[in-house]
Amino acid sequence: MEIKTFLEGALKEDLGHGDLFERVLEKDFKATAFVRAKQEGVFSGEKYALELLEMTGIECVKTINDKERFKPKDTLMEIRGDFSMLLKVERTLLNLLQHSSGIATLTNRFVEALNSHEVRLLDTRKTRPLLRIFEKYSVLNGGASNHRLGLDDALMLKDTHLKHVKDLKSFLTHARKNLPFTAKIEIECESFEEAKNAMNAGADIVMCDNLSVLETKEIVAYRDVHYPFVLLEASGNISLESINAYAKSGVDAISVGALIHQATFIDMHMKMA
């Protein structure tokens, strides 16, 4: 969904048929407002906020940038426009910044806990309906990378896909003939044997799903000897406390759905000058 279309929908959701305050406002005038943080975090949502302000004729006098850290009481944005329009935009603007910064902040905590420049931290497709692009943009601002944006990015085969596949190697041979040349094939595995079979069958990426660090290390050791060009991804209930151990197991990437679905809003407010 294009940013403008997304923002138009978000604004309309809040405005309904119009802000009732306009009926009681005797005369409109120019005013200045400040968006300030009430807790620390990593800023995200700048691109969406600036587009929203431009759409509504509000001037952004000053803003901090995506990926910047902030502390409680810091001024994140200074905006100026018609008093009535500032009030119309207030909640939508805050929702965008609070939600996006919440994801970026939690993602950054995982990046710091990962403590590795060799292992990539990835998000997942566990996103809120119609918010995927927005939420994955927020992950990038937190310092991680995006996994697939959708089903058309790569062929990922899970247990539900493979339930009725009798010969995995033959299936992958058939798949490659029907996929774009650049499309990767990733197979989700829940045991050493499944991972071994996936590599033997020709998978480009093997996901070690819900496996212990020890089990993951065994798969890494097998990969390193027999299929050094296969990429390994660890996934499944990986926490801030365990992510560093998984990083040290030798995998190439770690995907964490919690970056998005466990993130909470960063508290902010808007105050008039």
Identify what each model region corresponds to.
Residues M1-E190, E194-A201, I205, K217, ...:
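Acidic/glycine-rich phosphate/pyrophosphate-binding loops and surrounding catalytic core
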Residues A234-S235, L240:
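Structured functional modules or segments
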Residues V220:
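A conserved short alpha-helix in the GNAT/GCN5 acetyltransferase fold that borders
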Residues N210, G236, A258:
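Short secondary-structure boundary segments
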Residues R223:
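Conserved hydrophobic residues forming the short capping helix/wall of the S-adenosyl-L-methionine
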